[in-house]
């Protein structure tokens, strides 16, 4: 948490701890000793070539914006960004950082959970859904909600189980053939009852096959995998009507 010359920056220190290492215009970094390295800049470096350089006229939703790294980068490309998070600490960091980067007029910050988006009429050209899915108690509900909000693209990222094998399940698995679910590449998701990385909100770890299957089941198609655990998706098809009714009941949403 220091400027290039090594002097600490009081405004950064008073907002610590930081999970995003932001590179501010004056040379300041917010978390230069981050255990993951220059995070999330190294993720952005891999993803950025897959996102249009010109985002003027695009509306973007950043779900779980944290300190605002991605919101700031997308605003720099011309997007109007709505950035939501449930943690006021992160939102304070993000608002401050957006001002330092002179993009605060392009970003609207709100404190709210992902599920509350179901009650809003707005939709977005790009939905940014990174680092949130596995923290949710009801992850597929969130995917179903965000499918309704996505017009063009969604960037999805989740903590995952190791392995990239994909087994395509049969269209109808007989009940006495469930041993196939133990095969490598079967879509599965581990439930984390206790802690992972000392975080009590790390609930889930899907494997790669499960991520792709859940995205398909929610009405997305994977266009690219720009980085480890990252999936660039586009809306595709529709989800079955019974699940639409279930979503409405889960979030107390009135029929259209």
Regions found by a protein language model. Give the residues of each.
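Conserved alpha-helix/loop element of class I SAM-dependent methyltransferases that forms part
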Residues: 37-56
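Hydrophobic adenine-recognition pocket in adenosine-nucleotide-binding enzymes
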Residues: 132
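N-terminal, positively charged/glycine-rich alpha-helical extensions of SAM-dependent methyltransferases
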Residues: 1-30
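Glycine-rich SAM-binding Motif I of class I
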Residues: 68-72
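Class I SAM-dependent methyltransferase Rossmann-like catalytic core
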Residues: 28-39
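Class I SAM-dependent methyltransferase SAM/SAH-binding core
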Residues: 73, 77-111
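S-adenosyl-L-methionine-dependent methyltransferase catalytic module, highlighting the catalytic core
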Residues: 114-116, 124, 128-129, 137-255
């Amino acid at each position: 948490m220091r400027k290039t010359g090594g002097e600490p920056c009081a405004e950064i220190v008073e907002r610590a701890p930081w999970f995003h290492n932001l590179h501010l215009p004056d040379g300041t970094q917010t978390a230069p000793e981050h255990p993951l390295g220059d995070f999330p800049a190294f993720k952005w470096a891999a993803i950025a070539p897959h996102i249009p350089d010109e985002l003027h006229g695009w509306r973007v939703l950043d779900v779980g914006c944290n300190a605002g790294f991605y919101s700031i980068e997308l605003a720099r490309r011309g997007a109007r960004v709505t950035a939501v998070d449930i943690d006021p600490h992160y939102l304070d960091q993000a608002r401050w950082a957006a001002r330092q980067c002179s993009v605060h007029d392009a970003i609207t910050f709100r404190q709210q959970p992902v599920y509350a988006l179901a009650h809003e009429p707005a939709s977005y050209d790009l939905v940014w859904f990174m680092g949130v899915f596995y923290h949710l108690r009801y992850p597929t509900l969130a995917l179903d909600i965000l499918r309704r909000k996505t017009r063009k693209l969604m960037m999805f990222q989740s903590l995952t189980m190791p392995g990239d094998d994909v087994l395509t399940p049969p269209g109808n698995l007989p009940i006495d053939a469930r041993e196939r679910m133990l095969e490598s590449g079967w879509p599965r998701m581990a439930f984390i009852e206790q802690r992972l990385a000392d975080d009590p909100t790390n609930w889930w770890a899907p494997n790669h096959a499960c991520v792709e299957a859940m995205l398909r089941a929610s009405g997305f198609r994977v266009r690219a995998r720009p980085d480890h655990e990252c999936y660039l998706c586009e809306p595709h098809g529709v989800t079955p009507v019974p699940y639409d009714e279930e979503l409405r009941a889960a979030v107390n949403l009135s029929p259209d």
